[in-house]
Every structure is written in structure tokens, then in C-alpha cells.
């Protein structure tokens, strides 16, 4: 995939921008706080339909404005398409999505239209955060290419909310509760099986990537750790834990309690890994998602790399350069030009550099 054009209006600190991209490597260079990551965020929203930094769309609107607008022109093989996102906060909150001038009502209809892989210093929370962060990572990844998975996940969460409301009522009708039990198991088992399948594939890519980064020293792997193993166990645990759930007021078992173990028999990297091991794991993990898109789904995503170049040592940088070379297109943010020379070296005739100052963007040679 290839992003050929980006239009931004009233987004973050950018009033109006129109940028054309004709190269494989795009560098946004500027001091901290100038708005370079905001450009990456805009691209990310066109892909994910949400920000990687902010949960509220209204906080993305430029100060003093009432709406923002994003447009991206995307090329996939020989086919070009246009994706548009508009958000208005006044007089009422409204979001409008368009694909090739046609209004889109369902978010799932845009899945797979523009696929990106993001690497940011914030990714360390996948390792250092709790199970919820790792579930969020795997769910977001699968949802980026499987609309039925996303719909099932949304439905599961609705069912869970209804079941929890019944539990909190203190004296629920057991027959009514059993209806929700059957529904939550049906949706949950589909999600469980899909997570298990995808993590197994990701692990094979992750281990190869990590071996390249660490010289084969770490021996770590990804292991899906479900809270329930199958349909029968799910139902049995729901029944067994009913008294406890009534006391707690929420559902204590299910796929919403799963985890993604990262480590080996000897250690869990989330608890015992060094900072270097954690950085390697994050890079290997994100690269594994890139490998999955490329080798399993036969699509090459756009890479979005937010200010991580300086943090990489020589070995990790060499590996990352090789990854970038195999990508269709990559966008970088950085505070200086020194850190990009390794990338420019192999693709020196395929680069564009944009200097960002006070919300203004200037193309430089």
C-alpha cells in the first residue's frame, strides 16, 4: 500500500495542509511540540479510524474550530481510492466517513482499505502494562483485517454488559441469565479460536524476528493464555462462579480475562525483562504483524514510525533498516536528520523530507 496524498484541516495544531507523497521514505523533521507526530496521527486515523494517543475525537480539533477533516489518497497495487473522515463537535457531535465519495455507515466496511503498522515509544505498554493492554493489542490487530471478528468483539462486550447488569441487580431471573450465558459463550468461543489461530502464526514470525535482533539468545515466544479453553469449560465456569459473580456484581470468567504471555519457561519478560529485551520484543512483535499482513494476507502495509530511531542500538537499527527496505512505504518522525542516514543510504533516491515548524510544513531537499 502507498499513501499518495494527505489533506488536513483543523486537526491538532495544523490549520490546513495538502501534502503529496511520491517516495517510499517520508521524514517529518521538527523539534518536540511542533506537530510532526500529529501528521503521523492523522495518517493513523485514516487507517484505524481512531487515534493512537487520544480517545476523544473532540480533543483532536484545532483550538477555536468546530470540526476537523482528513483525506487520504491511497494506492494499492494499481488501484487508487480516496478515504475521507470528518468530525464535527457543534451543534451536535457527528462523524462522517466516505470511501470514493460514497458515505460509509458501518466502520467495518472500511476494514482493510488502508492498512498501517505503527511503532511508537508508547508500545512498551504492551509489555509493561497488564493483560488488558495485551488483549487490546491482539484485538486491534485482528480487527484491522477481519470485520466479523470486530463485530463479534463488539457484540461480546454488549452481552457482557447486559450480564453484568443482571448480576448487579442482586436477584436476577436465572432463566434470563442462562440466555445471556449461551450468547456470551457462543461469541466468546469464536473470539477465543481466532485469537489462538492468529497468535500461533504471529509467534512463528516473532521468534524469527527476535532471533535476528538478539542473535538467538533470548528464546522467547508468544503464548495465548485463555481464561477458558473451550465451550464446555466456559459454561461450566459460568455456572460454578455464579454465586461469586453475584457477590462481585460482574462476570469473573471469560475471554475478557485472557492474556498474551511473552517469555519462556524460565521467565516472563513482562516481569523480568531488561529494557533492551523489552525494546527488542516490541520491535519483533510489531514486525511480526507486518510479516502477517505480507505473508498471510498478501498485502504490504504502510509503516508509521514515531520517533524511535534514536533509541535503537546498532544491531536493532540494522534489523529495522532491512524491515523498512521490504516495506512499500514508511513514514518517520524525528527531531534531527542525523538519525535517518542509515535509512536514506539504501533508498537515497526514494525519500522526501518535510520540515515542521509552528504548524507549518515545508518540503526540503
Swiss-Prot record:
InterPro entries recorded: DNA-binding_RecF, DNA-binding_RecF_CS, P-loop_NTPase, RecF/RecN/SMC_N, RecF_2
Compartment annotation: Cytoplasm
Main location: cytoplasm
Keywords for the protein's UniProt record, in alphabetical order: ATP-binding, Cytoplasm, DNA damage, DNA repair, DNA replication, DNA-binding, Nucleotide-binding, SOS response
GO CC annotations, alphabetized: cytoplasm
One Pfam family it belongs to: SMC_N
Entry's Gene Ontology molecular function annotations: ATP binding; single-stranded DNA binding
Binding site for ATP: 30-37
Top-level taxon of origin: Bacteria
Family to which the UniProt record says this protein belongs: Belongs to the RecF family.
Protein name: DNA replication and repair protein RecF
Natural source organism: Leptospira interrogans serogroup Icterohaemorrhagiae serovar Lai (strain 56601)
Amino acid at each position: 500500500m502507498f499513501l499518495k496524498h494527505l489533506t488536513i484541516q483543523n486537526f491538532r495544531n495544523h490549520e490546513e495542509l495538502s501534502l503529496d507523497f511520491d517516495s517510499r521514505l517520508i521524514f517529518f523533521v521538527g523539534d518536540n511540540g511542533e506537530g510532526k507526530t500529529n501528521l503521523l496521527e492523522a495518517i493513523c486515523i485514516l487507517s484505524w479510524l481512531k487515534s493512537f494517543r487520544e480517545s476523544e475525537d473532540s480533543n483532536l480539533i484545532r483550538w477555536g474550530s468546530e470540526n476537523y477533516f482528513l483525506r487520504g489518497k491511497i494506492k494499492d497495487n494499481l488501484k487508487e481510492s480516496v478515504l475521507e473522515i470528518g468530525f464535527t463537535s457543534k451543534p451536535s457531535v457527528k462523524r462522517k466517513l466516505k470511501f470514493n465519495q460514497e458515505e460509509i455507515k458501518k466502520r467495518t466496511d472500511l476494514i482493510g482499505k488502508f492498512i498501517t503498522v505503527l511503532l511508537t515509544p508508547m508500545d512498551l505498554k504492551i509489555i509493561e502494562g497488564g493483560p488488558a493492554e495485551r488483549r487490546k493489542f491482539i484485538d486491534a490487530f485482528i480487527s484491522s483485517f477481519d470485520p466479523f471478528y470486530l463485530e463479534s468483539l463488539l457484540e461480546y462486550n454488549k452481552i457482557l454488559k447486559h450480564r453484568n447488569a443482571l448480576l448487579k441487580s442482586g436477584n436476577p431471573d436465572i432463566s434470563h441469565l442462562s440466555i445471556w450465558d449461551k450468547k456470551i459463550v457462543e461469541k466468546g468461543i469464536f473470539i477465543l479460536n481466532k485469537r489462538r489461530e492468529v497468535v500461533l502464526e504471529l509467534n512463528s514470525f516473532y521468534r524469527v524476528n527476535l532471533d535476528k535482533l538478539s542473535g538467538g539468545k533470548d528464546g522467547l515466544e508468544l503464548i495465548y493464555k485463555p481464561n477458558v479453553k473451550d465451550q464446555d469449560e466456559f459454561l461450566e465456569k459460568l455456572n460454578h462462579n455464579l454465586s461469586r459473580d453475584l457477590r462481585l456484581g460482574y462476570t469473573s470468567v471469560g475471554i475478557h480475562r485472557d492474556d498474551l504471555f511473552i517469555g519462556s519457561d524460565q521467565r516472563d519478560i513482562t516481569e523480568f525483562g531488561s529494557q533492551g529485551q523489552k525494546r527488542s520484543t516490541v520491535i519483533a512483535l510489531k514486525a511480526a504483524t507486518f510479516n502477517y499482513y505480507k505473508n498471510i494476507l498478501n498485502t504490504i502495509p504502510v509503516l508509521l514510525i514515531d520517533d524511535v530511531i534514536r533509541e535503537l542500538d546498532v544491531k536493532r537499527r540494522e534489523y529495522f533498516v532491512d524491515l523498512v527496505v521490504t516495506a512499500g512505504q514508511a513514514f518517520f518522525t524525528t527531531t534531527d536528520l542525523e538519525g535517518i542516514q542509515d535509512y536514506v543510504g539504501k533508498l537515497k533516491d526514494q525519500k522526501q523530507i518535510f520540515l515542521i515548524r509552528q504548524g507549518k510544513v515545508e518540503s526540503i531537499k
